[in-house]
Amino acid sequence: HIIGTDIYFDVEFHSWTSNNSGGGFSYTRTPADGPDLPDGYFRKPDFADASLPENQDRVSDDIWITRGNNQALYHAAFEGSYNYNGGHSHTGGPSPSGTEWASGPTENHSSIESYNTFLGAVGGEWGTENLAGQTYSMHIIGTDQYYDIQFHSYTMDQQNGGGFAYIRTPATGPEIPDGYFRKLNYGDPNLSFYQDRITDDVWITRSN
């Protein structure tokens, strides 16, 4: 299967040179019909390179969700790995930056104040053990965009590959009052998500 597409092939191998003897191989590749992928489905396989676009859920031009070979989700356009940014190792930092999360479907929430960091919403690192089968609400900070994130898998334990899969479905979330601004705990004050940019040269934020 070609990730991010509906293209599948049957690959019948004819030869494979082993024992470091040259790396030769041969096969016949035949187009095939594979399973339909639900709209909004995304999967990063274990040990897949998180820096590659096909292993990032590019929600928008500047929101790219992925995960390294361990730890939690992060935002690949602004973060090179999960960012604690001073947060406790078990309760976590603001990653993935630019997003905030709440437990359960978006329709369950009537106030933006119920949203938290990803690890804050799932109950810390230990909470990720039970992500498969659970639905969380994700809000894109600074917008009225909400999504229901239904997790199908989430590889646990350190150095086991960092794989995960979910279906992301647009949802209607709580209205945000005009002029409302909030910086999450441990949000990086150098990022625009955590600055109230009142004018081109007046940006209000706060350090940790």
Stretches with model-predicted labels:
Residues 1-2, 136-140:
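Short conserved beta-strand and strand-loop elements enriched in small hydrophobics
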Residues 1, 18, 24-132, 160, ...:
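N-terminal "domain-start" segment
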Residues 17, 142-143:
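Short loop/turn positions at the edges of beta-strands in beta-sheet-rich folds
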Residues 12-14, 137-139, 150-152:
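Residues within well-ordered beta-strands of beta-sheet-rich folds
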Residues 27, 146-147, 154, 166:
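Aromatic side chains
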Residues 14-21, 152-161:
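Short, exposed beta-strand-loop hairpins at the edges of beta-sheets
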Residues 5-10, 143-148:
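Short coil-to-beta-strand transition motifs
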Residues 9, 23, 162:
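Residue-level signal for beta-strand positions within conserved beta-sheet cores that form or flank
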